[in-house]
């Protein structure tokens, strides 16, 4: 309830007054072109004794005492601590240790400790009119009258109210004046608002027109007292200004508001265009303990007023009033642009008031005007000063300024605002680190470490020692006791931390501090070529007290990961031999204490285990940078730390027994593995990149541990490990190259375990995959897209760059001869869909119970002989019918077979590539071992060669490939496994047959390792083979040169033709007769994929898959097929193994050393930042899990360059038909697999929660999410419909008002115009032979004109009569002075004149009566007849009177003459 009361009393006080201390110009003038906003360009920090001011285009910060001395005296010069050219500043204030400076469009901050750091905090969407700073919150009123609050700590904006004209805020209260002239008051607590009360204008003031008295400003004088200003609206474009304002003191008591008008507070007589704003300085307890004294100034006035909570105070003396000066340039009043109070500076004030000689302290009011001039006046109260009760409360003053006491810096624009999340996460357990927890990380596949793992290394280590924006920037020295972290910088940080270890922006990014004793770890470790940079901290008892941000010099100890804490340095721990600039670059570290639980350079490792190596225990043997070897041995580090040096040695790997250690997959689950599996415990020393292998009785698992290794070269172990008879299975989640039972492949989670279907893993990249890649794709813990943004340099999806494989992929030929008749028979049987198990062909299987006579029966006995030289690698054996086998697992064999043995190798029966998978498995189920699946198939083509090199040492392949290529290769791996199985079988059959003669061929000096194009022979890593290391080196060099030659070829087809011609010329006729086309089917299968050659490039509508099958007899592989040596010297037909070194040729390259240096120096943190920054971000996750595109659909297959085996034309037609049909089947399988992959991906839902945040990226949505998308769209439509309806309603109201006012008037005018137009048309009608009657309007006009004419005629006649009388008087004066008759006539004439008037009046009345009677009697009449008659009669009477008068005069003169 509001009421209007009497005027506020104004007291002329003898006590209150202002003491003028001085005035000087300190800043440039605005020149009357002030920003149209509430200028608050002066602020004083009494606690810091500093001031900030802005005027013109300059902002300054300086010492307050120096400013006062400069103003009050002429001797002290003024210097500033900081100054900057900033145009159109509208707001400055102190905020803790910073200064806020704002224009209408942006907010800036200045660090008082680092005055050079002037940065942009945020930019405003709409121009700003008014700002207030309170409790770390900036309250903003913009040009569209929206009131919002900007949190200076989080930069988040929250809208408070709309249609706001003005507001004022204190620490606990927010007052708002709305455009409808209503008031609202809110309680302000911790940034949250709660409405206290609201009221509107009294009914008496409601009558004031809004156009003239619009709401302008509201000011809080006390919690219950307000000052409101109403007046005319001023525009920024106005040239001349005149203010007409009404001010009211509002007191709100017990739910009712009383309005009292005042005329003496800052009377608005300003002459400069200003945005209306009221400045105030509140002094609490200055005179009375509970009363406020408010010093008020207005942007529209040059006077300063005092309000003492009860009345307006005016000093009695004019000299004691505070008035701004008149401009010397324009002779106009100046007005304030900033007002502040100073209560801390010192200086004696002489004669402040009457009766007081000097005083040391007064509240000094600093007033900055629009010309940059600063005036200082001191507020005094004579009685209080004399009585000693004049109290200046500094604490209440600072509290009233609403400045934040915290020294926390404001986040600047462009910084990642991760601190919002970190404040909550910092107090959580370490397992909730976004890079350690399986539930919170973007890599949801991460496994948790054992809860009881005893580690000396912190589990909360971030990816690079610490997160990007948070706790230690480059290094974290974690305290040795349990501690927690808060949202601000911890005061308990070690005093010896280096500068770089301090928080970058005051807070830890992820806020986790280890709860276990931990040692310091470097964020970026030691330098690029120096001490450990990534991860493994020193595990010795004594941690470094302080460390450099980048550790020791650039050329020192290992760069990526290992730290040495033992007394002795490591024997050999090079990642790539010896590093380029010092000690091992990537290698492992040594620890004299227990192994760390997760001593990752990345905190907890990015993929579940340590990122770049942990310290091993007890011994200091060398280890791989990536843990164990890619295929059972250490990855890259040779025994003597020289990979390519003269001391290159090959040591034999050891196969550790399984110790019930479960190495987790470093990649996310595909969804098939249960969460329990994803959380399974791993060994405390598991690490994806750099474990000290086999230094204790308990082996340490590795996420990239493809086999166990004690030390030595990664290649040597891989080469020597092939001699073992241990086998592997396709489709299992255990790595085929791991020597430990529980060691799962890091890439085993690409696909589901399809062992029941007998197919290869769904993640296989092409038709033929090497064993490593096959098992990399079997793990259930990863999805394809998660591999491309790894924080460990994309080691998850390892692919070498596919060099121009579209053109250079060449066919690998078999080494020895094989009967063309036998191969033709085999092909015909396959084409006829004959069950191979039913044929019992001993050449292709081990089914010894049923042997039938065949041209190949001579080789049956040698097939099943035990051999220690098993082929290096095979894809022929898949996971089909694993359940029907019962051979011991490869891990069990690893315990019992430390060296290569001659035990029997049970080969699988033939898998017919042309039969359905079920038929093949039916014929082979009885011949397969559960884990013994050695196959000697080979892979041809550039793509398969690339894969071989990748799989051989998968952990380093990514060092050479572009990330885009890695993504493409991985996307290809999401295809159906059946096609891979289909492509492998044929080569497997041939490899078995060739194995019988390969050994004899080797003894006879025949070459058994050839490389055609990029084709490489593959070998299983967990099979062992003894061979010469020097031969491996030599073959590595040969292969390196052959790869360079192959990359220079222009096209694949031309190179194949050329090599085919050369091979035909070099080899014997017998070799030419043995080369059969069916051995090259693997080329068809290999090259049919989009990245495997020219085949299947459906770039046009009628695209076809081009199969280039070419035979080259110069370079052969033992694995390309089963060879038969018909010579007599071939007494023992065994499987050839000399092609093994080829497998390593693609990985043993000199480039590794350069890549090592590159990895040491590249800013790897960028990749890590993307993970830390976008952790949990829906858009980021949607991008990572975006749906796969539907691959190209091939319409046909094109087979060219078929190498015919037979010379018979009929057989050649059969061969050509077979090749064509097989190619068409291959194309069909490829299309089916592509569609299956697409449908499977569309059917999955990788993101549990989808909101409107990711609706802009529609390509990341899948079909099952359509309902969610529809709901979101419906919700948006509902919101938009509400807005639209409101707009429509508003428009209807405007239209109604327009119709009611404007349209009604227009309608009336149109009706009148239409009436007149119709009348004119009728009047203008030529057919009318008579004059039309006048309309009513015309008749009125006619009547009016006639009446006026009548009046004019009457006046003329009267004038004539008077002239005649004048003439008579003239005659009388001249001649008739003595004649009494003339005088008598003159008098009588005057009397007759009155009579004439009466006669005229009577006639008019009679005429009117006649007109009325005629109007009643006749419908139409001649309106002018009566008037005409009247006028004629009037003229007759006039003439008669004139004649009579003349006659009388004539008679008079006649008689006079007669008398004479």
Swiss-Prot record:
Species in which this protein is naturally found: Saccharomyces cerevisiae (strain ATCC 204508 / S288c)
Region (Interaction with DYN2): 1086-1175
Gene3D superfamilies named among the record's database cross-references: YVTN repeat-like/Quinoprotein amine dehydrogenase
Subunit comment: Component of the nuclear pore complex (NPC). NPC constitutes the exclusive means of nucleocytoplasmic transport. NPCs allow the passive diffusion of ions and small molecules and the active, nuclear transport receptor-mediated bidirectional transport of macromolecules such as proteins, RNAs, ribonucleoparticles (RNPs), and ribosomal subunits across the nuclear envelope. Due to its 8-fold rotational symmetry, all subunits are present with 8 copies or multiples thereof. Part of the NUP82 subcomplex, interacts with NUP82 through its C-terminal coiled coil.
UniProt-recorded name of the protein: Nucleoporin NUP159
Mapped PXFG repeat ranges: 267-270, 532-535, 558-561, 584-587, 842-845
Keywords, alphabetical: Coiled coil, Membrane, mRNA transport, Nuclear pore complex, Nucleus, Phosphoprotein, Protein transport, Repeat, Translocation, Transport
Chain spans, region Interactions with CRM1 and GLE1: 497-701
SXFGXPXFG repeats: 462-470, 503-511, 522-530, 548-556, 574-582, 600-608, 624-632
Domain of life: Eukaryota
Region (Interaction with DBP5): 1-500
Misc remark: Present with 1230 molecules/cell in log phase SD medium.
Domain notes: Contains FG repeats. FG repeats are interaction sites for karyopherins (importins, exportins) and form probably an affinity gradient, guiding the transport proteins unidirectionally with their cargo through the NPC. FG repeat regions are highly flexible and lack ordered secondary structure. The overall conservation of FG repeats regarding exact sequence, spacing, and repeat unit length is limited. FG repeat types and their physico-chemical environment change across the NPC from the nucleoplasmic to the cytoplasmic side: SXFG/PXFG repeats are especially abundant in NUPs on the cytoplasmic side.
Record's compositionally biased regions (Polar residues): 536-546, 556-567, 582-593, 607-619, 727-750, 757-767, 778-800, 861-889, 942-958
Pfam families associated with the record: Beta-prop_NUP159_NUP214
The keyword Transcription is assigned to this record: no
Positions with biased composition (Acidic residues): 804-814
Region described as Interaction with NUP82: 1223-1460
Ranges for the FG repeats: 228-231, 642-645, 687-690
Positions carrying Phosphothreonine: 803
Record-listed Phosphoserine modification sites: 404, 657, 724, 735, 745, 805, 819, 889, 940
Comp. bias regions, Basic and acidic residues: 917-936, 960-1002, 1017-1027, 1035-1061, 1068-1092
Disordered as annotated region, ranges: 401-435, 483-504, 533-619, 647-704, 727-824, 861-1092
Primary residence: nucleus
Sequence ranges of the SXFG repeats: 610-613, 709-712
């Amino acid at each position: 309830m509001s009421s209007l009361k009497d005027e506020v009393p104004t007291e002329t006080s003898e006590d209150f007054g202002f003491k003028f201390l001085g005035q000087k110009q300190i800043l440039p003038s605005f020149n009357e072109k002030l920003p149209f906003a509430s200028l608050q360009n002066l602020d004083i920090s009494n606690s810091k004794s500093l001031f900030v001011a802005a005027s013109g285009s300059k902002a300054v910060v300086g010492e307050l005492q120096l400013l006062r001395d400069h103003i009050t005296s002429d001797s002290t010069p003024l210097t500033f601590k900081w100054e900057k050219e900033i145009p159109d500043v509208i707001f400055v204030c102190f905020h803790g240790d910073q200064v806020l400076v704002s224009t209408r469009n942006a907010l800036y901050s200045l660090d008082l400790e680092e005055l050079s750091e002037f940065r942009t905090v945020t930019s405003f969407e709409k121009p700003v009119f008014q700002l207030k700073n309170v409790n770390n919150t900036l309250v903003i009123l913009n040009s569209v009258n929206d009131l919002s609050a900007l949190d200076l700590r989080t930069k988040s904006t929250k809208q408070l109210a709309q249609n706001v004209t003005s507001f004022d805020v204190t620490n606990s209260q927010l007052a708002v004046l709305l455009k409808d002239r209503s008031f609202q008051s809110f309680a302000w607590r911790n940034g949250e608002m709660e409405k206290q009360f609201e009221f509107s204008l009294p009914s008496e003031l409601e009558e004031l027109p809004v156009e003239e008295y619009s709401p302008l400003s509201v000011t809080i004088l006390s919690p219950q007292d307000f000052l409101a200003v109403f007046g005319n609206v001023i525009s920024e474009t106005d040239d001349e200004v005149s203010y007409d304002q009404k001010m009211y003191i509002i007191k709100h008591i017990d739910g009712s508001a009383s309005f009292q008008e005042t005329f003496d507070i800052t009377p608005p007589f300003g002459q400069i265009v200003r945005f209306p704003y009221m400045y105030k300085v509140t002094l609490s307890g200055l005179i009375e303990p509970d009363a406020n004294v408010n010093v008020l100034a207005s942007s529209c006035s040059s006077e300063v007023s005092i309000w003492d909570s009860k009345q307006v105070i005016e000093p009695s003396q004019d000299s004691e009033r505070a008035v701004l000066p008149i401009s010397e340039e324009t002779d106009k009043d100046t007005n304030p642009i900033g007002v502040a109070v100073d209560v801390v500076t010192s200086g004696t004030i002489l004669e402040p008031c009457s009766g007081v000689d000097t005083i040391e302290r007064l509240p000094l009011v600093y007033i900055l005007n629009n010309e940059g001039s600063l005036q200082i006046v001191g507020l005094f109260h004579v009685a209080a000063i004399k009585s000693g009760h004049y109290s200046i409360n500094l604490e209440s003053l600072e509290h009233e300024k609403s400045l934040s006491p915290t020294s926390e810096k404001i986040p600047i624009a462009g910084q990642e605002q991760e601190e919002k999340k970190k404040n909550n996460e910092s107090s959580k357990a370490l397992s909730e680190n976004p890079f350690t927890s399986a539930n919170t990380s973007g890599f949801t596949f991460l496994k948790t470490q054992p809860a009881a793992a005893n580690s000396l290394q912190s589990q909360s280590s971030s990816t690079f020692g610490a997160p990007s924006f948070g706790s230690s920037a480059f290094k974290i020295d974690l305290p040795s006791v349990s501690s927690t972290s808060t949202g601000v910088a911890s005061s308990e940080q070690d005093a010896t931390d280096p500068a770089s270890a301090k928080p970058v922006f005051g807070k830890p990014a992820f806020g986790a501090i280890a709860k276990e004793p931990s040692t310091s770890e470097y964020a970026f470790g030691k330098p690029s070529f120096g001490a450990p940079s990534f991860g493994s901290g020193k595990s010795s008892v004594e941690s470094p007290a302080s460390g450099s941000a980048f550790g020791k010099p650039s050329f020192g100890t290992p760069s990526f990961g290992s730290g040495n804490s033992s007394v002795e340095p490591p024997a050999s721990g090079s990642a790539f031999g010896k590093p380029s600039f010092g000690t091992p670059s990537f290698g492992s570290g040594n620890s004299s204490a227990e192994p760390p639980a997760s001593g990752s350079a990345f905190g907890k490792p990015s993929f579940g285990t340590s990122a770049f190596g942990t310290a091993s225990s007890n011994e200091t043997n060398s280890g791989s940078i990536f843990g164990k070897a890619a295929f059972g041995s250490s990855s890259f580090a040779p025994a003597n730390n020289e990979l390519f040096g003269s001391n290159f040695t090959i040591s034999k790997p050891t196969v550790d027994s399984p110790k019930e250690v479960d190495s987790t997959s470093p990649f996310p689950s595909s969804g098939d593995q249960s969460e329990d599996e994803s959380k399974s415990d791993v060994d405390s020393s598991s690490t994806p990149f750099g474990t000290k292998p086999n230094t204790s009785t308990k082996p340490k698992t590795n996420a990239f541990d493809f086999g166990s290794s004690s030390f030595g070269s990664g290649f040597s172990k891989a080469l020597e490990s092939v001699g073992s008879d241990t086998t592997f299975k396709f489709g299992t989640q255990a790595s085929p190259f791991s020597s430990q039972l529980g060691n799962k492949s890091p890439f085993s989670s690409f696909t589901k375990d399809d062992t029941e279907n007998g197919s290869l893993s769904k993640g296989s990249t092409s038709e033929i995959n090497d064993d490593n890649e096959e098992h990399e794709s079997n793990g259930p813990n990863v999805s394809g897209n998660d591999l491309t943004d790894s924080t460990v340099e994309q080691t998850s999806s390892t692919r070498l760059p596919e060099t121009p494989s579209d053109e250079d992929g060449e066919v690998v030929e078999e080494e020895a001869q094989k009967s063309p008749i036998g191969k033709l028979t085999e092909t015909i049987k396959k084409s006829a869909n004959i069950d191979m198990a039913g044929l019992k062909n001993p050449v292709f299987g081990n089914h010894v119970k049923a042997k039938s006579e065949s041209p190949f029966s001579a080789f049956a006995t040698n097939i099943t002989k035990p051999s220690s030289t098993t082929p290096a690698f095979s894809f022929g054996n898949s996971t089909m019918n694993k359940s029907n086998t019962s051979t011991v697992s490869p891990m069990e064999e690893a315990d019992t077979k430390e060296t290569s043995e001659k035990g029997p190798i049970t080969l699988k029966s033939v898998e017919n590539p042309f039969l359905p998978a079920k038929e093949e498995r039916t014929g082979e189920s009885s011949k397969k071992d559960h884990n013994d699946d050695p196959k000697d198939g080979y892979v041809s083509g550039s793509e398969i060669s690339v894969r071989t090199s990748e799989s051989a040492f998968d952990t380093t392949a990514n060092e050479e490939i572009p990330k885009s290529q890695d993504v493409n290769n991985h996307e290809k791996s999401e295809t159906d496994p059946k096609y891979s199985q289909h492509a492998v079988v044929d080569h497997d059959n041939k490899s078995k047959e060739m194995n019988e003669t390969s050994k004899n061929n080797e003894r006879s000096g025949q070459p058994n390792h050839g490389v055609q194009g990029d084709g490489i022979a593959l070998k299983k890593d967990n099979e062992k083979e003894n061979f010469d290391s020097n031969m491996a080196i030599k073959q590595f060099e040969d292969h390196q040169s052959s790869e360079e030659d192959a990359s220079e070829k222009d096209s694949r087809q031309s190179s194949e033709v050329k090599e085919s011609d050369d091979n035909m010329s070099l080899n014997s006729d017998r070799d030419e007769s043995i080369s059969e086309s069916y051995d090259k089917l693997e080329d068809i299968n290999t090259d049919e994929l989009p990245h495997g050659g020219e085949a299947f490039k459906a770039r046009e509508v009628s695209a076809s898959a081009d199969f280039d099958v070419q035979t080259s007899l110069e370079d052969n592989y033992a694995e390309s097929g089963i060879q038969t040596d018909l010579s007599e010297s071939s007494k023992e037909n065994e499987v050839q193994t000399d092609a093994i070194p080829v497998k390593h040729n693609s990985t043993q390259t000199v480039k590794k050393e350069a890549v090592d240096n590159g990895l040491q120096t590249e800013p790897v943190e960028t990749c890590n930042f993307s993970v830390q920054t976008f952790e949990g971000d829906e858009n980021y996750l949607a991008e990572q899990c975006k749906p796969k595109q539907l691959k190209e659909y091939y319409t046909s297959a094109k087979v060219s360059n078929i190498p015919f085996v037979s010379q018979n034309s009929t057989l050649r037609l059969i061969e050509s038909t077979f090749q064509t049909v097989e190619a068409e089947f291959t194309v069909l399988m490829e299309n089916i697999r592509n569609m299956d992959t697409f449908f499977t991906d569309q059917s999955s839902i990788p993101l549990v929660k989808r909101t409107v945040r990711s609706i802009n990226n529609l390509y990341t949505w899948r079909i099952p999410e359509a309902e969610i998308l529809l709901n979101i769209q419906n919700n948006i439509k509902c919101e938009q419909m509400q807005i639209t309806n409101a707009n429509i309603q508003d428009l209807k109201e405007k239209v109604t008002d327009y119709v009611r006012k404007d349209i009604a008037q227009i309608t009336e005018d149109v009706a009148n115009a239409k009436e007149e137009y119709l009348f004119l048309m009728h009047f203008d009608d030529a057919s009318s032979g008579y004059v039309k009657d006048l309309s009513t309007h015309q008749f009125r006009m006619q009547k009016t004109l006639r009446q006026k004419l009548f009046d004019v005629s009457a006046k003329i006649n009267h004038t004539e009569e008077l002239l005649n009388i004048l003439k008579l008087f003239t005659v009388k004066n001249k001649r008739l002075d003595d004649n009494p008759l003339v005088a008598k006539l003159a008098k009588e004439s005057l009397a007759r004149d009155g009579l004439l008037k009466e006669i005229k009046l009577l006639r008019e009345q009679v005429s009117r009566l006649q007109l009325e009677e005629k109007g009643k009697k006749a419908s139409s009449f001649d309106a002018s007849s009566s008037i005409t008659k009247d006028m004629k009669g009037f003229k007759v009477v006039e003439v008669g009177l004139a004649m009579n008068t003349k006659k009388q005069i004539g008679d008079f003169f006649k008689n006079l003459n007669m008398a004479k």
